[in-house]
Amino acid sequence: LQEMFKRARQSRLIPYDPAELLSLPTVTKGRRRSITEEERTAILRISQHHRAGLWILTLLYTGMRPGETAALTWADVDFEHNEIHVHAAKESGSRTIKGPKTASGVRDIPIHAALLPRLLESRGKPFSLVFPTKAGTVQNESSMRRMWNSFIREMEEESGPVADDLTPYCLRHTFCTDLQRAGVSINVAKELMGHADIQTTANIYTHKDSETLHKSIALLDGSGGKPGGNVKVG
């Protein structure tokens, strides 16, 4: 609209540009978050038997992007050195496998002790996909969404309503905050997350969720870290 008025003014079709003083509204991007302890408990429980359980645990314990898990083969799961080698990802909007956008996307992630037995249990042929579709093809956005939605439905059946903002990327975010809580340096976290810019890692390291804030204030008011706790006065 602004461009249209600008051209009309330049062509002297209108005496002035009515859009010149307009300001565009600020758009606030949705903020990814870590999972709550209640969500973690439910996720770990359902992962024990759900068909997408290994995929969910891999997202949670490696911080990999969903597109990176789609490209993962058993040759990338290095049981000898207890590492997962990340060097490829599914191209957005297709099933094509490509290299990472930046060199930082290539990385080795140690296998979490809780993830190792599940990987060993599902171990396949070296160059077969770790998370194929039922047809044996590379996952795309639609198939991964179906896996996620199926998992969420079971969470709701067992634990009640699930927050609308709980997405696979919340598990990646949680991996990073778990590193921060464990005292892992931000530089190491950047490497494990595959971030090209350390500021991206810093934004997660410095972002405190509501649960963390309530726990910290509990040291002062004796509320136990829960909203609505008893506040000591005086």
Model-derived segments and spans:
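Well-ordered beta-strand positions in beta-sheet-rich domains
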Residues: 34, 83, 106-110, 202
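Catalytic-site neighborhood detector that most strongly recognizes the C-terminal catalytic loop/helix
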Residues: 26, 34, 90, 116, ...
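Non-catalytic DNA-binding core/recognition domains of DNA-processing enzymes
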Residues: 1-8, 111, 148
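Basic, Lys/Arg- and aromatic-enriched nucleic-acid-binding interface segment
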Residues: 10-72, 80, 91, 104-105
